[in-house]
Amino acid sequence: TKYVNFLQTQEDDKLNGVITGTVDISDPSFSANTVDAIKKANANDDVNGPKITTDTVDNLGYGYIGMSANTMNVNNEPGSDASKAYRKAFATVLAVYRDVAIDSYYGERASVINYPISNTSWAAPQASDPGYKVAFSVDADGKDIYTSDMTADQKYEAALQAALGFFEKAGCKVENGKVVSNPAGGKDTDAYAIEREALIPADGKGDHPSFMILTEASKALEKIGVHLIVTDLSDSTQLWDTIEADQADMFAAAWGATVDPDMYQIYFSGMDGKAAGGSNYMYDINDAELNKLILDARASLDQSYRKTMYKACLDIIVDWAVEVPVYQRQNAVIFSTERVNMETVTPDITTFYGWLSEIQNVELN
């Protein structure tokens, strides 16, 4: 191929472009709706066919729901036990709706994760590892919230009861199964003891993997007197502007990862105050032990040692309750079977080696 024309386009136009012939190769979000549309275009109930050929790999990154420790805290002490409990109340309810939401949006093309790290990383904890826990699955007393025989509805109710325990630990007053005061002893608004807002860039139409999590959690929290406002943004720049201004309570987003799982950029807060130029402003974690572990881990070449250090880091991050890990999704690259000579496309595409790595070999029919 001598010339390649790269086009910036809207998500809705990616698949349609390949189907209609205006685009040869694209990378649509691989949602259940996208899969259905590809199968329909191929007319063979398969994502590979006469119209479209699909290649999938695990995404080098993951989706999450974040919280700012600077806005979501008690008595302006982001790292206190009370502040962590306050955030864990919300995180517990959010976490319990991950399974149903991700299954609804992605189907089998994504999985729920329990630590804030991509499953593509060698440092990602595995279910068989010692100390592995489902995210936000213990109550304020450190006891398991769920049992293996619980139904989904029973889990939702158990999460609410656990949230009440965390709100009490944060200093809120709870009466008859409802939160009746915030940690300061008053009310956030005339109608609610606690009112918070979650921002989600779902194109103004609920098109986001975490949208169902937030809306279901909002309905559930309402039952215990807590108001979670879900704001669906049509322009994602509003999300980043609000986060950077340190005015966001909660937000849905995703991290891109690198081959090396170094956590310095996102979680290091600086040994003598906030580190300039990093991404720690997203959560405002300020934890001396976490800082030391991050520096120790990045100073070593021993992968086994680093994995142990990073697991300790992840446990601290989860304890701060500023990030609810949500999903590990698959990436899809779709090719026009009619126009692209698939024999010339990279045969062994992986998370780390994409079709662009051998773009010089790609030919059109």
Locate the predicted segments by residue.
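Periplasmic-binding protein-like
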Residues: 76-136, 142, 146-168, 209, ...
